Amino acid sequence: MRYAQAVVRTSKASRYLKALCNHFDRKVTATYDDNRGWVQFGFGECRMDADDTQLVFGIRAEDDEHFARVMYVVKDHLERFSGDEGLQVDWVEYPFLDIQPLTNIP
């Protein structure tokens, strides 16, 4: 299993979280509220946490190919959705991240 995290500074973190999860939910399973999101791609998973100043992504995937794909999909979508704000996603890989699915969101 491979893990990575990215912290993106933005005052619109909740807006981007909801937009990303709503978009992904059209093709894969996504659960979210205003401040937390969980996307279960067929090739990996992504946890999102938003507050007033940042959007934090935590991802995991079983192998190198799927890991690269999750990183690309999340990065590409946020960078396109952010338009003129020009947000950048810079991944930091970790040997382990405690990335858990959201259980208390309807």
Residue ranges and their predicted role:
Residues 1-13:
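Terminal, regulation- and interaction-focused segments at domain boundaries
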Residues 3, 34-38, 52-56:
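A generic structural signal for beta-strand entry/edge sites
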Residues 8-10, 59-62:
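Short beta-strand-to-loop capping motifs
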Residues 26-44:
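Ser/Thr-rich, low-complexity intrinsically disordered terminal regions
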Residues 46-61:
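Beta-strand/loop substructures that line and gate deep hydrophobic ligand-binding cavities in soluble
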Residues 61-102:
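C-terminal structural segments of small proteins and small subunits
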